[in-house]
């Protein structure tokens, strides 16, 4: 199993520890990607407010998800006080042609990339959390929006 890249919010110097993902994304690009997701080297509101378990901001995946030749990254953070019963949230960021990073999607829950695709080759994302009827997000050329729901108890 691939090691995870953990972003230490306590360190003002944007300390990043990694075993394998660091090889996939240069340090400066990691910092830009975290910044696009809203994590800029200070403690997040989730980290400050959390009284129970807190999972630090982590870069879970670095991969070209839409086939444009540029890397994309999935960033997660765990906190029941910020993300409710799901206990986790995700941020999908993408490197743009100008070298900047853009937030493509963020939700409470876990992201599961599906084989189906929206515009520009972006994979649909099933947002998994508590329950058994989950939204599926599809990229429409501007942003990810709820496209449909999947699960045992969905009545569509």
For the regions a protein language model found, what residue spans apply to each?
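Beta-propeller blade termini
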Residues: 56-67, 109-124
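Repetitive beta-architecture junctions, highlighting loop-to-beta-strand starts
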Residues: 58, 88-90, 132
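Short glycine/acidic-enriched loop and turn motifs that connect beta-strands
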Residues: 79-82, 132
């Amino acid at each position: 199993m691939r090691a995870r890249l953990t972003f230490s919010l306590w360190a003002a110097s944007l300390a990043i520890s990694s075993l394998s993902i660091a090889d996939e994304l240069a340090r400066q690009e990691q910092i830009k990607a975290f910044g696009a997701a809203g994590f800029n080297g200070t403690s997040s509101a989730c980290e400050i407010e959390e009284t129970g378990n807190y999972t630090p901001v982590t870069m879970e995946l670095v991969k070209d998800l839409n086939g444009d030749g540029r890397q994309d990254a999935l960033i997660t953070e765990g906190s029941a006080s910020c993300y409710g019963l799901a206990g986790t949230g995700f941020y999908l960021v993408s490197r743009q042609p100008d070298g900047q990073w853009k937030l493509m999607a963020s939700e409470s829950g876990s992201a599961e990339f599906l084989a189906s695709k929206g515009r520009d080759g972006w994979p649909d994302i099933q947002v998994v959390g508590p329950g058994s009827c989950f939204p599926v997000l599809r990229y429409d050329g501007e942003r990810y929006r709820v496209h449909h729901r999947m699960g045992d108890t969905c009545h569509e």
